[in-house]
């Protein structure tokens, strides 16, 4: 939930425009009319919908995927894999696509990256930003689309988590601790988004590769010592 708040704070302008355009789109459907060209905010809504579709393929195996988090060898290898993707990201030719020119296939491929990122140890933002760069997105748009694409995913994950918590029985004494966690996640998430925007301008996503490699190797070493 904290991550969702951070995205809303960082991209409120885009979210507001999409909400407005969503209702305008309903009105256009009622009148059987389509504006030409399609407004950027409306195209962005459609791109996000297409990018979210691959997640539905993961739902039937959600428990199995989550179970991989207990295998630290898998998590370590996934971190190293993420590092290689980020390293390659800076070496891809800079794209120019934004919501005005990105295709449905582009969005679908980024969505596949997001589905792969449900695997423990694979960074969701790292995977989707890298996928965006690979399909030719302008770097700042790759970051923006990555986080806007996270809204349906994070919202769905929170709904499932709340459902599980209700079934397990929520302890009232734990609510304040949960709220503190949400606040910390919101602040941290917002700062991370600002940092990624800065890195997008500088074109240095590969700097995160070394962090992922170090974390991955450390995970494998510590697991091997046990």
Please describe what each predicted stretch is:
Residues 1-226:
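Multi-pass membrane proteins that catalyze or facilitate reactions on polyprenyl-/lipid-phosphate substrates
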